[in-house]
């Protein structure tokens, strides 16, 4: 006959085990951002696996944002755009992006559109700089569009502390989506020249935390 003491001990052991397991379970993100990804002709030409590459860039940026802010980026779809024409200017590409994928005609399956470009234009030039449609805020809504020129082929290999330069660029632009602005702090990823910087300054960190629950622009 099994004693009451042994039964109680077994129950307590099971409860301790379950509590220990739950302690290691990741907490759900505070915000999930659904991404519609688009890739241009040069991006597709350099890598037959362009779908996987685009998803990897978003996942790498998501790893960073989920760890730092509890914001998860999820790729809903990846498509070829523009299909044939090359557009070596990020301001022009952004204007076309907003026109061809207006918020009013969105089907509700995504929150933001990220267009990846493989055009070989220096980021020093205006035509080669990453772009967003707006600096997000709670009163007018968070940004909806990003144009991101990429420098080289990227392969996602899992979460890492060493961020690729194109991933850093995407982290920077997503910062704008949530209201982060350029600063003079050379150590901040929101400095205009953000290469090899991987941390937000205190002001922009607070802005993102405060805005992460805000609605997207309509």
Predicted feature residues:
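The catalytic-center signature of Zn2+-dependent metalloproteases
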Residues: 143-218
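Bacterial N-terminal signal peptides that target proteins for export
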Residues: 2-11
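Metzincin-family zinc-dependent endopeptidase catalytic domain
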Residues: 51-169
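Active-site-proximal beta-strand/loop segments in catalytic clefts of secreted hydrolases
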Residues: 38-42, 76-78, 115-120, 180, ...
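Acidic/histidine-rich, surface-exposed loop or edge segments in extracytoplasmic proteins
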Residues: 31-48
């Amino acid at each position: 006959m099994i004693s009451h003491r042994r039964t109680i001990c077994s129950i307590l052991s099971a409860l301790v085990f379950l509590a220990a397991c739950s302690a290691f379970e990741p907490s759900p993100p505070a915000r999930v951002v659904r991404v519609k990804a688009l890739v241009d002709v040069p991006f597709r030409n350099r890598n037959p696996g362009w779908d996987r590459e685009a998803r990897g860039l978003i996942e790498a940026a998501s790893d960073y944002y989920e760890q730092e802010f509890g914001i998860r980026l999820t790729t809903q779809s990846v498509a070829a755009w523009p299909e044939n024409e090359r557009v070596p200017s990020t301001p022009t590409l952004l204007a076309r992006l907003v026109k061809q994928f207006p918020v009013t005609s969105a089907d509700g399956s995504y929150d933001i559109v990220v267009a990846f470009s493989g055009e070989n234009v220096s980021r020093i030039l205006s035509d080669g700089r990453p772009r967003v449609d707006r600096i997000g805020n709670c009163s007018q809504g968070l940004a909806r569009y990003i144009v991101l020129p990429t420098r080289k082929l990227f392969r996602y290999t899992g979460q890492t502390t060493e961020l690729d330069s194109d991933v850093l660029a995407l982290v920077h632009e997503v910062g704008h989506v949530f209201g982060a602005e350029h600063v003079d702090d050379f150590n901040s990823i929101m400095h205009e020249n953000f290469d090899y910087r991987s941390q937000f300054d205190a002001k922009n960190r607070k802005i993102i935390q405060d805005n992460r629950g805000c609605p997207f622009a309509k």
